[in-house]
């Protein structure tokens, strides 16, 4: 029984599915997808639970969320292992994901009060009050790269605001989704407030097409995001928040500390085996001897990265990709770029055929035409050389995406110029592209998304503002508008 609907664990009636470890092929989870009728049942349960949940005092909702945080802390080791085994991440990185989930609780509570909550301004004859109300029933679509942390940011914020939810994890990480929901169950959520439906494309389409849905919060690929946008077009009454991918540039100017720049680049491009939406996909390196030395050192150090199993000791910097098919897609993208005229600086290599273990690849594409503007979700870094900083900014903006952008430079003036001219939601200076603060908004422009539904601004998309002018007494104004006559006529 792998679906949780209206407080009950039930068996899916859709397609049979199983999840294996992407390196060892060990079977981790088996179950059936939710069919369309079960998706509709989950929505009905959420709708029925909404009025009572929304009317709960905020402190009551907060208490359940904080109980969930305590359960995350108590089961940190177990959840770390689930995430690591299911995604192929090294244990150390999965542990940081669970820590981020725990920390997000306190941040989300602060964000609720700062971004939404209630504010009152006293007037001469009353008060002006701003309140926020939940949308109603929201769907949350989770990604596979951070199957615990990223959906958690939506779910916690939405529940605090008083919404009820249907959560569909990625079909590639059903085990993590189920494990997290069982902790919510133990935290004491009332039946129907949060519902779990497992499945792939058909389940997702059934969920996003429900008439009784008030909104959808999505994190994932641009292709799926665009499909959801088309599906919900003509429905302005529904909130649709899309956090999608990026084809992110990292600019390397003249640097004094080459090893520090190489370390920053490795953290930007290859952490999580390149499976972060903010990962550097395009490396823009200034022409000249220093740029040559930087690239040579990057190739040297990146060539020593050996992806390993989730439980290797000593631990590896990167693990496997989410699946062997994902690794094959990265290999095909590398070969495509070679066929276009790219010059391989570091060849990607499958560590073992049939697994998702893939070494990093680096390919130079300076002067190559018709390079696809796409997000290759894996450890493949494309290099362009440039002559001057204005050209670097032009190259950086030469994409339909706009998620993250970074600069390695000692020149503050260059960073100031980049801040003015970069088309990206996150712009970092001498910091990895993959570094982001949960106390700041997270998201991008263009094909990278339409809002900031993650991190600090998540609260904004989980409630709508209600403005009120109010007075405990009704009185006639001392001064009337022109043309109004309230004088009493003498009776004839």
Swiss-Prot record:
GO terms for molecular function: succinylglutamate-semialdehyde dehydrogenase activity. Keywords: Arginine metabolism, NAD, Oxidoreductase. Pfam families: Aldedh (PF00171). NAD(+) binds at residues 220-225. It is an enzyme of class 1 (oxidoreductase). Catalyzes the NAD-dependent reduction of succinylglutamate semialdehyde into succinylglutamate. This is N-succinylglutamate 5-semialdehyde dehydrogenase. It comes from Salmonella paratyphi A (strain ATCC 9150 / SARB42). The gene is astD.
